[in-house]
From Swiss-Prot:
Similarity field: Belongs to the TRAFAC class myosin-kinesin ATPase superfamily. Myosin family.
Compartments, record wording: Cytoplasm, Cytoskeleton, Actin patch
Domain spans labelled Myosin motor: 41-715
Residues that bind ATP: G134, E135, S136, G137, A138, G139, K140, T141
GO molecular function: actin filament binding; Arp2/3 complex binding; ATP binding; hydrolase activity; microfilament motor activity
Official protein name in the record: Myosin-1
SH3 domain location: 1065-1124
UniProt keywords, alphabetically: Actin-binding, ATP-binding, Cytoplasm, Cytoskeleton, Hydrolase, Motor protein, Myosin, Nucleotide-binding, Repeat, SH3 domain
SUPFAM superfamilies, per the entry: P-loop containing nucleoside triphosphate hydrolases, SH3-domain
Ranges where the IQ domain occurs: 719-739, 740-765
Disulphide-bridged cysteine pairs: none
Comp. bias regions, Low complexity: 987-998, 1008-1052
Length: 1212
């Protein structure tokens, strides 16, 4: 198997290292501690064993088997030990974990082999094959199924054809298992045939077809099995699960009725449900596409085979074979659709054609007749099996052009029994051919890699088994197969004479790997010496039906038999047909030719015990398998040069932590080439020069111990970092919890009421721009909540109303609120009375609340089915009145008033999808009396903002335009950002406790009382007006030289002058977003695009604005505040005068004179609002105190700038 290659990551390629020799390639990712790493059991790759021997391999496999690790690598070869239990390692989660992963990234697994094969096929357009070998019961079939499962899962494709191909490929497993598998002493589900499944893919890696080639079906099992073994599964499935139709048509009875299924005294198997598996077989036939007629034909042949076994013969008076039960002959003839006399003649009469050309009919004895009977059954089953495989191939034929393929070979492993015959010779011959492929591809690839990488190495000596393959298959000089054919040709009429002739040919062969013995011969295979018995071997090689049976098939009335046996019998043709040896040689060479065109992967399966126990590990038996599978040779070949080799990039990615020159705090810091980085790592880890070599693209490590040392140092690196990682992890948990809380808070604010907002927007479409709107109806904060009274609640006032009026549990309230109904008064004008309006999914309720005997009584005054409402009448004005046009002959239509009318209409449209009819006109129509329509006028003459009904008319005011839509949702009150300080990942004041980056250029103003003279002198002082400066200086007393000497040796600098007055407060300007017409005297009319000044802001949605000489209120949602320009920086003041010299040369100024009585001192400049003559401690310190607004804004700005920058990693 070739090395799994991975294409360069395009995303990572963009982050290439600039300037280094490795520029253009992705740098290694930051290293992370493998917290979920599972402790290794033994070694996962046998090439890493310190001592290579069969016993050491066996011990390592035993450790891993007992630790529930059944897979082990030998380089790229996978060794699999059958666990005889479900380890839970084939789930979808495990399968997904291997997708897109390199073999070295994950533990050994059959999915890794499948991923490697599929990836190389797709990425590099190489045909792939997976060769699975091992003895019966070692898990070959299971491994093949898992590879098919993985490829079907990862190969993609959503089209119907591709999914159908996948289903059919998976359906081949139960179908071929039922016809090709059987219970043996060593395996309850042993494959008694070999198969090579090729899955064909298109150019994008989607399966578009498949084909199957079968090898070496053990057809002798049809007619006989040893005790406690079974025939093929299908016979027991069919006899136990056949339908009544089949039982009547084909005479199917229980398996104990038939000799072929009951002779071995084993009808049932633990863990196998024949009835359930028969249904799986039938389902697989349907998936693959077998018609009912084809299925009937298949089961007819199976029934014929079963009844063939019940033909029993006895000797007649002349010693020839005679049938015991004629009824069996007649029923078998019925199944085969031939004449009963012709059938019995074909079995009991042998047709001989000597060299003279004369046709001789020779009666058969009992033994010969039984042999012919069994030959008939074996031929029927063998040809039926071949037809099923061919039929599967027809269904799986590619339906579009193919690009590449992945092949799966599941075939017998070496068989060495006490008595070995022709079957074992064929099986072991095929395994020799596969071993030859393994040697040529694996060892040759190893040698080519050393030459390509220019590595100094010792040439590997190995046994080339080509000499053994030639011994078996050669034509000149003749090999074993040719000798078998020649012996049959020489003495074809006498099997014993054929065997003797063949043995003479074997004795005449000269080959170091062939040892003739008396009645047998030994071939030295690569897996061990095998002694083959000569008795009967030539007869098995002929593998021919008698011409009488072939002639009977040609005259059968069953067309399916003609399909199974298409060849016409030429009685005059005495040319010898191809033998079984010829066919297996041709098939094996074709298989080798196919595999040589592919990139192979190998799976060696091992059976741990003979008892199918999940805990038993039979050391001698496994050791025997290790020897004949050649695992030790595989390890030695892999280790002959170097035990470990890896590309420079991957080596650096794995071990860059071990050198301080290539890493810092888990980050890759090397700026040079990857090759130089490898040398630096090996140098810093003190690996001797003789333990490694540098190739052209790879680094080679000589011994496994060196690799173990590197891995140990890498693991210890993380142990040394454990404390720091734990601390950071706990901090991260606190940080994550705080972040999650903030995200949840934001999400709740964002999502709350979203569906109500959508419903509100739908309300505009319900009105269709035909009705004027109220200003409050189109506010941005308006939501259509629906059930305002809580009628759907389980408790509270709403539940009390629901129970009082009897709303059923199957009714859901979609709208409820308080409104009014127009009640007619006798002799005077109608009057609006309060009511509760409820809309459910089926009815419209008008609920009245009355006080009866001091108790509130709630009754449903009207309960109108929604289907009875013919129309809803409303005016085009902004009023809230509407009518329900019911047209009842007994009651008048209700005329209602509801301030949430638009929402009510919207909810009613939802529950009345087919019958909702909203009539909007200049007036409102309704039946004031049954059958008598009346028109209610709507007049826009009301000085009152509230609508009212009077004298048959509704009086209202002018509303918003009918095409008005809801205003944008007003923005929430801005909240200053607050950094997450939980977990100490971000500390107050900036990351890592340092001052926030946004405040580094801001110089704090020290308090004058605590500053030294030099500090004060060095601080820039804002400039002041000369007059103010002189006035301030005149008011400050100055010490004399004597005073300075008595108090302190240092001279205190005079305090700085006060800062300049703050600039005038900037105007707040806003831009008008929408037109607004003022309805009242204190409301300002504005137009879109105007700029206005905001004088005052209120939290009720209205701002006091000023435009020119007009000052009035405007809606806050209609304007957008403009960002203000930063205030100008005040000009700096001149520095204070220098302190007087201490040497007395400069005469000090005299103290200021006190003001004369009755005179006021000169007035000072007004002080800045930020100055205070009274400090917070009660002193008369003039420390400048910045205003609260400016300091808060500055702090928020600094914090925001600190949060916006990346986290500082110096904490590491």
């Amino acid at each position: 198997m070739g090395i799994t290659r991975r294409g360069k990551d395009k995303a990572a390629a963009g982050q290439a290292v600039a300037g280094g020799a490795s520029g253009g390639r992705a740098r290694p990712k930051k290293a992370t501690f493998e917290t979920s790493k599972k402790k290794d059991v033994g070694v996962s790759d046998l090439t890493l064993l310190s001592k290579v021997s069969n016993e050491a391999i066996n011990e390592n496999l035993q450790k891993r088997f007992e630790g529930r690790e059944i897979y082990t690598y030998i380089g790229h070869v996978l060794v699999s030990v059958n666990p005889f239990r479900d380890l839970g390692i084939y789930t979808d989660q495990v399968l997904d974990s291997y997708k897109g992963k390199n073999r070295l990234e994950m533990p050994p697994h059959v999915f890794a082999i499948a991923e490697s094969a599929y990836y190389n096929m797709k990425a590099y357009k190489d045909n792939q094959c997976v060769i699975i070998s091992g003895e019966s019961g070692a898990g070959k079939t299971e491994a093949a199924k898992r590879i098919m499962q993985y490829i079907a899962s990862v190969s993609g494709g959503d089209s119907t054809d591709i999914q159908q191909i996948k289903d059919m490929v998976l359906a081949t497993n139960p179908l071929l298992e039922s016809f090709g598998n059987a219970k043996t002493l060593r395996n309850n589900n042993s494959s008694r045939f070999g198969k090579y499944l090729q899955i064909h893919f298109n150019s994008v890696g989607e399966p578009v077809g498949a084909d199957i080639t079968n090898y070496l079906l053990e057809k002798s099992r049809v007619v006989g099995q040893i005790t406690n073994e079974r025939n093929f599964h299908i016979f027991y499935q069919f006899t136990k699960g056949a339908s009544e139709h089949y039982r009547q048509m084909f005479g199917i009875q229980k398996p104990e009725t038939y000799i072929y299924t009951s002779r071995s005294k084993c009808l049932d198997v633990d863990g196998i449900d024949d009835l359930a598996e028969f249904q799986d077989t039938l389902n697989a036939m349907k998936v693959i596409g077998l018609s009912q007629e084809e299925q009937d034909s298949v089961f007819r042949i199976l029934a014929a085979i079963l009844w063939t076994g019940n033909l029993v013969f006895r000797e007649d008076d002349e010693g020839y074979a005679a049938v015991t039960d004629q009824s069996v002959v007649e029923f078998l003839a019925y199944l085969l659709e031939v004449d009963p006399q012709q059938l019995i003649k074909a079995i009991t009469i042998r047709i001989l054609t000597p060299r003279s050309g004369e046709v001789i009919e020779s009666p058969a004895n009992v033994a010969q007749a039984m042999a012919t009977r069994d030959a008939l059954a074996k031929s029927l089953y063998n040809n039926l099996f071949d037809w099923i495989v061919e039929r599967i191939n027809q269904s799986l034929k590619a339906r579009q052009p193919t690009s590449n393929s992945v092949g799966i070979l599941d075939i017998y492993g070496f068989e060495i029994f006490e008595k070995n015959s022709f079957e074992q010779l064929c099986i072991n011959y095929v395994n020799e051919k596969l071993q030859q492929i393994f040697i040529q591809l694996t060892l040759k690839a190893e040698q080519d890699e050393y030459a390509r990488e220019q590595i100094k190495w010792t040439p590997i000596k190995y046994f080339d088994n080509k000499i053994v393959c030639d011994l078996i298959e050669s034509v000149r000089p003749p090999g074993v197969f040719s000798a078998l054919k020649d012996a049959t040709k020489t003495a074809h009429a006498d099997p014993a004479a054929c065997d003797r002739t063949f043995m003479q040919s074997v004795n005449g062969m000269s080959n170091a790997h062939l040892i003739p013995r008396q009645g047998s011969f030994i071939i030295k295979h690569y897996a061990g010496d095998v002694a083959y018995t000569v008795d009967g071997i030539t007869d098995k090689n002929k593998d021919q039906l008698l011409k009488g049976l072939l002639g009977m098939f040609q005259v059968s009335q069953n067309p399916f038999l003609h399909t199974l046996f298409p060849n016409q019998v030429d009685q005059d043709n005495r040319k010898q047909p191809p033998t079984a040896g010829d066919r297996i040689r041709t098939s094996a060479n074709a298989l080798v030719e196919t595999l040589m065109k592919c990139q192979p992967s190998y799976i060696r399966t091992i059976k741990p015990n003979e008892n199918k126990s999940p805990t038993e590990y039979n050391v001698p038996n496994v050791l025997h398998q290790i020897k004949y599978l050649g695992l030790q040779e595989n390890v030695r070949i892999r280790r002959a040069g170097f035990a470990y080799r890896q590309s420079f990039e991957k080596f650096v990615d794995r071990f860059f932590l071990l050198s301080p020159a290539t890493s810092y705090a888990g980050e890759y810091t090397w700026q040079g080439s990857y090759e130089a980085a490898v040398k630096q790592i090996l140098k810093d880890t003190s690996i001797p020069q003789e333990e490694w070599q540098m190739g052209v693209t790879k680094a080679f490590i000589k011994s496994p111990e060196t690799l173990f040392a590197l891995e140990h140092m890498r693991d210890r690196y993380w142990h040394n970092m454990a404390t720091r990682i734990q601390r950071m992890w706990r901090a991260y948990l606190a940080y994550r919890a705080e972040s999650a809380t903030r995200i949840q808070t934001f999400w709740r604010k964002k999502r709350t009421g979203a569906e109500y907002l959508q419903l509100r927007d739908h309300g505009h479409r319900v009105l269709q721009g035909r009705k004027e709107r109220r200003r409050m109806s189109i506010l941005g904060s308006r939501r259509f909540i629906g059930d305002y009274l809580g009628i759907n609640a389980s408790s509270g006032p709403g539940a009390h109303i629901r129970n009082a009026i009897g709303i059923g549990s199957n009714e859901k309230t979609v709208f409820s609120c308080r409104g009014e109904i127009l009640e007619a008064k006798f002799g005077r004008s109608s009057k609006a009375s309060p009511r509760i309006l409820i809309v459910t999914n089926s009815k419209f309720y008008v609920v009245a609340q009355m006080l009866v005997n001091g108790q509130v009584q709630i009754t449903a005054e009207k309960a109108i089915p929604l289907g009875a409402i013919k129309f809803i009448g409303a005016s085009s004005s902004r009023d809230d009145w509407f009518s329900l046009g019911v047209g009842s002959p007994q009651e008048a239509d209700p005329l209602l008033n509801c301030v949430l009318k638009t929402e009510m209409f919207t909810q009613m449209e939802r529950v009345m999808p087919g019958g909702f009819n909203l009539k909007i006109g200049d007036s409102i129509e309704y039946a004031k009396k049954p059958g008598k329509m009346q028109v209610v006028k709507v007049l826009k003459d009301s000085p009152n903002p509230v609508d009212f009904y009077k004298s048959g008319a509704v009086h209202t005011q002018q509303g918003e335009p009918p095409n008005s839509v809801s205003r944008p949702t007003p923005k929430g009150k801005p909240v200053p950002p607050r950094p997450i300080t939980r977990g100490k990942l971000i500390r107050p004041g900036g990351p890592n406790g340092r001052p926030a980056r946004g405040t580094t250029n801001r110089t704090p103003q020290p308090r004058p009382g605590g500053a030294s003279a030099s500090a004060v002198a060095s601080r820039p002082v804002p400039q002041a007006q000369p007059q103010a400066q002189a006035q301030v200086a005149a008011s400050i007393p100055v010490r004399t030289q004597q005073q300075s000497q008595t108090s302190s040796a240092s001279v205190r600098a005079p305090p700085p002058p006060p800062p300049a007055a703050p600039p005038a407060k900037a105007k707040i300007m806003a831009k008008v977003l929408y037109d607004f017409a003022g309805q009242k005297e204190n409301e300002m009319s504005i137009k879109e695009g105007d700029l206005i000044e905001i004088v005052q802001k209120e939290n009720n949605g209205w701002w006091l604005a000023k435009s020119g000489n007009q000052q009035a209120w405007v809606p806050a949602a209609y304007v957008e505040e403009q960002k203000q320009a930063p205030p100008p920086v005040a000009a700096s003041r001149p520095p204070p005068p220098a302190p007087p010299a201490a040497n007395g040369k400069n005469k000090p100024l005299p103290p200021a004179k006190r003001p004369a009585a009755g005179k006021k001192p000169a007035s000072l400049q007004p002080r800045d609002s930020g100055m205070s003559l009274n400090g917070s401690d009660g002193s008369r310190s003039n420390t400048p105190t910045p205003s609260l607004g400016n300091s808060l804004a500055d702090a928020l700005l600094a914090r925001k700038q600190a949060m916006a920058k990346k986290d500082d990693d110096d904490d590491w």
